[in-house]
Amino acid sequence: MPVRRGHVAPQNTFLDTIIRKFEGQSRKFIIANARVENCAVIYCNDGFCELCGYSRAEVMQRPCTCDFLHGPRTQRRAAAQIAQALLGAEERKVEIAFYRKDGSCFLCLVDVVPVKNEDGAVIMFILNFEVVMEKDMVGSPARDTNHRGPPTSWLAPGRAKTFRLKLPALLALTARESSVRPGGAGGAGAPGAVVVDVDLTPAAPSSESLALDEVPAMDNHVAGLGPAEERRALVGSCSPPPPVSAPGPHPSLRAHSLNPDASGSSCSLARTRSRESCASVRRASSADDIEAMRAGALPPPPRHASTGAMHPLRSGLLNSTSDSDLVRYRTISKIPQITLNFVDLKGDPFLASPTSDREIIAPKIKERTHNVTEKVTQVLSLGADVLPEYKLQAPRIHRWTILHYSPFKAVWDWLILLLVIYTAVFTPYSAAFLLKETEEGPPAPECGYACQPLAVVDLIVDIMFIVDILINFRTTYVNANEEVVSHPGRIAVHYFKGWFLIDMVAAIPFDLLIFGSGSEELIGLLKTARLLRLVRVARKLDRYSEYGAAVLLLLMCTFALIAHWLACIWYAIGNMEQPHMDSRIGWLHNLGDQMGKPYNSSGLGGPSIKDKYVTGLYFTFSSLTSVGFGNVSPNTNSEKIFSICVMLIGSLMYASIFGNVSAIIQRLYSGTARYHTQMLRVREFIRFHQIPNPLRQRLEEYFQHAWSYTNGIDMNAVLKGFPECLQADICLHLNRSLLQHCKPFRGATKDCLRALAMKFKTTHAPPGDTLVHAGDLLTALYFISRGSIEILRGDVVVAILGKNDIFGEPLNLYARPGKSNGDVRALTYCDLHKIHRDDLLEVLDMYPEFSDHFWSSLEITFNLRDTNMIPGSPGSTEWEGGFNRQRKRKLSFRRRTDKDTEQPGEVSALGPGRAGAGPSSRGRPGGPWGESPSSGPSSPESSEDEGPGRSSSPLRLVPFSSPRPPGEPPGGEPLTEDCEKSSDTCNPLSGAFSGVSNIFSFWGDSRGRQYQELPRCPAPAPSLLNIPLSSPSRRPRGDVESRLDALQRQLNRLETRLSADMATVLQLLQRQMTLVPPAYSAVTTPGPGPTSTSPLLPVSPFPTLTLDSLSQVSQFMACEELPPGAPELPQEGPTRRLSLPGQLGALTSQPLHRHGSDPGS
């Protein structure tokens, strides 16, 4: 396996840095996008949600001016300051009164901080909220609602309280001259000039609105007031409001959508404007500023409004808030200009605008920087790190820090590995052989290290080990969170807790510390402490444990190294006993005798060091492998005890290595084979499809990241080998964090959680990976468990989501999956839990008692559904609105009836053209009965979102011919009186059977008639069977269901009888088509004229076989089950609704023409 590099891909740690710095200080903040209209909120932390009482889903996509927190006591001037700071992309502190969702008021200090990207452009704003005072605790009246309404009695106390707070500062105005002169410096006298920070009074409920990109025009005469007049205007006098373009009332709120095609927010970034605009103090942004301006007795020197403040502003640019500004100094052209021209901004249709260009005169520089007296990073307590930039950032590496995966560190590690191997081999050899030989040999000349090359190498090794310790203090490491740590302090602490002690003991140069003491044996023993470095070798070589060949080689080297150590010990035992032994039976004496180099009486002589070492190594290898030949044998007790130990070690080594070599190779190659097999497949795929290099690198990095995360374990393959009950427990354990902490799952039972855990799947995404593309089908719901993502529409960031956020679409509102309205891209390494739509609905169907709780508790942080790409959405009943009803009711007839039941009496409220037979449509000229044949057909089902009174109305074909009177419908059927009185409760039976009557009418009279689709009066369920047909009363749902079933049975019977009647009609037509009489008949063939033939014999007519009578009989049969008390509709003209037998007599006057040659005559 390669070196564990950690998360080294470029990540956007903007959100993580802000959260890490703010959460520990209980900060309450929001993040807004500066590149979209109204600066929509794209992130808010939990502290802000707790402060205002709104959930994150309710705050997302709202304007960052937080106008939804405004209330009666919200100062208009403070709201204007926030809007001006957003317009000018400048830092500012504003004190403002906000209202929570429950209506309680609190005084808040808002810090507006711009955030720049790597190019120096402001792309985001951070607004930090700090509660200064709870206004309910200082004697405020009953809780005010944060919804604007008409002025009430609390206005005067609220205004007086605010005035008392500002009075000491306002009285200081008498000690200075006015800084505003007519036509003087600053451009105050210029026509159309607008002073931004003007109002110190709280905003009253208004009927006008002011968007972020618009500033109201003030009266020009305010700029020319003197000191006394100015103070008087502030204390008591109020100027009339400026003229508006229209004298009538205007809406109090003008909505600005973030995107016309988006469905995220419909709120506006607007601040209210009082009808009574009080006089203003020019160039004063707060009461403290007014106090500070008292010291300046002389007015500022004259300068143009657009350039006068440019020079002091250059020094203010050094107060940077981003990394890019700390690196380079942006030119003055990159900052917001002092003068903004209203030609480039969007006009307000509710405010009057002069023909000349209007300018916003920016406050003076003291006002611009008065509320920001220190760096924003210090104000927001960001510590040493400056405000992060919103961009992909590689892991920040400290200066003089070495990456643990860098090429230099890899080469250095291999060098240290070679030195450790040298130490492991030569340190025992020197301690056992060379030091004793030096003591016994002649005295060495005074040549220092030149005569001892091993001593020089040992000195170099000691120096290299000390340097390695210093390098380890500056080498990065990977923590438990897979993050690369480069901070020197954290690296030092990590090294002290780890391998520092072992490395330090192994690097001590003992031969230099006790040089000249004469104790060479002690130095040799102390130098064996270098063998502790072997632990580092084991740690370094652990990365190669996945490769079977490397493991086998390491085991063989370990076996040889142990044999080398044992050979040194074997020689030390024989050398220690040789001088003190009277009998010459030791293995060294036997070796000297065999080689002809015996030891003399003084203990000198004997074999050479080379012969001794080779013989000792031969003995240890033969003993470890259990292949002893006997030519070198232990004779003394010490030698025999040592031989026993060697045999025990050899048996263990032989059994564990050589006896199981095949098993070891097979075991070690299993994971390696899987890794290389998968990597080979990936590379073959890349080669076959010719994947470009950037994409190829992403594939390989993702594969390595996924392999290090899962170690190549296929979770699905592992789970399939266990029973389902055990699979559910394992999945419940793997998803325990999500199921325990996510609010929608808290009320679920254990069985429901087990079923949900079986459906969840975990997804890992590296930085820059796109999880969902715009236009993709939304088939799953995503839960973020680690990392942060961004949602983009084009190149515009609309939301930043972090841990515990949910994105997707509300499945309970839509019957079919929709399409995504943006791209979802990972900013950091992310772990997400996703559950497919069908799986979630299946589980909720199995546990209906939990379904309602889940849908009510589920808050999707960002809705990805694009309602504009699906026909009929967002309110079409084909896609949404009553999803549970569509799942339970499959018949369209029942769905239409339920909608009519839920909206009784709403047909008449739809207005002209919506009800087919209502009075509103009849009274309109050219109503639905008089429309031209070219009019298009009506929609079969109306959207539920279009209005509360709209309901689906079925279509029917009606004959359309020449114009008729306004009160008469097509086919000669005027509207009945009861239907006119209650258009929403027309007779359902007549509506259901009218199609049958029209069929026969079409056969009877088809000349000059056309057909078009016209909406009928909807037939509500309560007026079906045994109640008065004109009654608009409502019935319980169970009664409606029973009556629907009865109506369905009647329709079935009608269909059966209609089929029989049709067969009779076809038989009659076949008889009339017989033109040639039979041979036995005396009747001649009739002439060509259709009316010249008359029957020879008088034949009684058959009323039951006529077309009209068949229609009447069918309607009578369909209504025969009506109760006796059911009233009848009054008949007008030839209307055939609910025909009775008494009407059949008038139809017998038309005889049926038959040929006299008919056999039945």
Swiss-Prot record:
It catalyses: K(+)(in) = K(+)(out). Residues 1037-1064 form a coiled coil. Pore-forming (alpha) subunit of voltage-gated inwardly rectifying potassium channel. Characterized by unusual gating kinetics by producing relatively small outward currents during membrane depolarization and large inward currents during subsequent repolarization which reflect a rapid inactivation during depolarization and quick recovery from inactivation but slow deactivation (closing) during repolarization. Channel properties are modulated by cAMP and subunit assembly. Residues 92-144 form the PAC domain. The S4-S5 linker acts as a signal integrator where it both couples voltage-sensor domain (VSD) movement to pore opening and closure, as well as providing a binding site for other domains that regulate activation and/or deactivation of the channel. Phosphorylated on serine and threonine residues. Phosphorylation by PKA inhibits ion conduction. The potassium channel is probably composed of a homo- or heterotetrameric complex of pore-forming alpha subunits that can associate with modulating beta subunits. Interacts with DNAJB12 and DNAJB14; chaperones DNAJB12 and DNAJB14 promote tetramerization. Heteromultimer with KCNH6/ERG2 and KCNH7/ERG3. Interacts with ALG10B. Forms a stable complex with KCNE1 or KCNE2, and that this heteromultimerization regulates Inward rectifier potassium channel activity. Interacts with CANX. The core-glycosylated, but not the fully glycosylated form interacts with RNF207. This is Voltage-gated inwardly rectifying potassium channel KCNH2. Residues 427-452, 519-522, 571-613, 635-640 are extracellular. Detected in heart, both in atrium and in left ventricle. Keywords: Cell membrane, Coiled coil, Glycoprotein, Ion channel, Ion transport, Membrane, Methylation, Phosphoprotein, Potassium, Potassium channel, Potassium transport, Transmembrane, Transmembrane helix, Transport, Voltage-gated channel. It holds the Pfam family Ion_trans. Belongs to the potassium channel family. H (Eag) (TC 1.A.1.20) subfamily. Kv11.1/KCNH2 sub-subfamily. Residues 260-271 have a biased composition (Polar residues). The keyword Membrane applies. Residues 930-941 have a biased composition (Low complexity). It comes from Oryctolagus cuniculus. Residues 233-286, 872-985, 1121-1161 are annotated as: Disordered.
